[in-house]
Each structure stands twice: as C-alpha cells, then as structure tokens.
Amino acid sequence: MPRHESAKKRMRQNEKRQKRNKSQKSRVRTKIKTLRSLDDKEEAEELLNDVKGDLDRLAAKGIIHENKAANRKSKLEKHVDALE
C-alpha cells in the first residue's frame, strides 16, 4: 500500500480510470458482437458507422492502440461487405 498522499491519490485515480476504460471497451465489444450477428446489410451498415466512431474515439483517448482500431474497422467492413 502506498504511504505518501500523492501515491494514494494516484492509486484512486488509476482505479477510477481503469473502471471507465473497461466499461468503454466492453460497450464497444458488445456492439461488435451485435454487428457480427446481424444478417441485414442495411442495419449492419448503420451499426458499422457507430462502431467505427467508437473505435476512433477509443484510439484517440489512448484506450486502445490506433493500429488495433484500424484493424478492427477493416475486418468489420469486410464482414459487412460480404453480407447480402
């Protein structure tokens, strides 16, 4: 356990940020799973735009790496393009 006040504060801040980041990543993962389960191309395209924005937002905030966001967007676009 930290002894200094600043270390205690840093620990509290890290826990708070970890919870926020985890919930944001979980929300995006849920949207991705929903997108992959869709069979209708129009619905999938609408959700794809939403997911792409979320991935860009996470990458901009440093929650996920920019390349990881780009790779996920690319794979999801291929998936939606393959739908009929």
Swiss-Prot record:
Classification from the root reads: Bacteria, Pseudomonadati, Rhodothermota, Rhodothermia, Rhodothermales
This protein is called Small ribosomal subunit protein bS20
Pfam families in alphabetical order: Ribosomal_S20p
* Gene Ontology MF term list: small ribosomal subunit rRNA binding; structural constituent of ribosome
Gene3D superfamilies according to UniProt: Ribosomal protein S20 (1.20.58.110)
Region annotated Disordered, chain positions:
1-32
Per the similarity annotation, which family is this?
Belongs to the bacterial ribosomal protein bS20 family.
* Highest taxon in the source lineage: Bacteria
